[in-house]
């Protein structure tokens, strides 16, 4: 069972009835996608009182700089980045939306002239991804990843946090990282998911006030 944090205790009870076999259950309680499913690892262990527990703390996907930054968003104390260094995370504040669009287009141009395979431009919702894709596709070669998408393509992809979960990109641009879009504890989980999709390079871009979910 993958993404254990997204299942409720009731759903686990159903799984146990349907599949009374040994199970391996994996997940990350820092990555909730459903705000109504907020329970703890202790709650899960009560459902499996005789289970063996192993905590995997080493993060191999992202650079040291990206994981260190992500821990400023979600305080996952036990998470240990590998000693693979890269660029510092970029936080870009724009005067208006037009400047924000231009910055994203420049990020796409830099990606296309580099040697990386996949750039993810990640929005908070599917609706926001569709809107941004509609603007970018007039000037750039970009893909849109939606619930209806059947496969993942390299290149530039615009998608939501929901659809990006489980994916990884060489580079990530988090769109609208402002204090209106990301402001609640649940938003903290979403922003953490978005940031940890990046393997080598992470940029957060916004207009207005930067989200307050990034700790000093």
Give the residues covered by each predicted segment.
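Walker B catalytic carboxylates
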Residues: 2
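Conserved helicase motor core of SF1/SF2 NTP-dependent helicases
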Residues: 5-216
């Amino acid at each position: 069972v993958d993404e254990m944090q997204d299942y409720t205790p009731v759903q686990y009870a159903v799984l146990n009835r349907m599949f009374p076999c040994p199970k391996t259950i994996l997940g990350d309680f820092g990555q909730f996608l459903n705000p109504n499913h907020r329970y703890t690892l202790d709650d899960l262990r009560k459902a499996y009182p005789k289970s063996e527990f192993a905590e995997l703390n080493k993060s191999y996907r992202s650079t040291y700089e990206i994981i260190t930054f992500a821990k400023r968003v979600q305080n996952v104390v036990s998470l240990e980045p590998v000693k693979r260094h890269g660029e510092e995370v970029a936080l870009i504040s724009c005067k208006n939306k037009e400047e924000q669009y231009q910055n994203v287009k420049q990020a796409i141009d830099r990606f296309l002239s580099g040697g990386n395979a996949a750039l993810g431009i990640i929005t908070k919702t599917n609706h926001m991804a569709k809107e941004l894709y509609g603007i970018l596709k007039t000037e750039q070669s970009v893909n849109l990843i939606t619930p209806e998408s059947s496969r993942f393509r390299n290149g530039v992809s615009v998608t939501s946090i929901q659809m990006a979960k489980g994916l990884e990109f060489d580079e990530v641009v988090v769109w609208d990282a402002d204090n209106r879009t990301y402001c609640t504890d649940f938003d903290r989980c979403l922003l953490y998911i978005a940031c940890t999709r990046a393997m080598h390079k992470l940029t957060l871009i916004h207009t207005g006030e930067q989200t307050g979910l990034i700790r000093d």
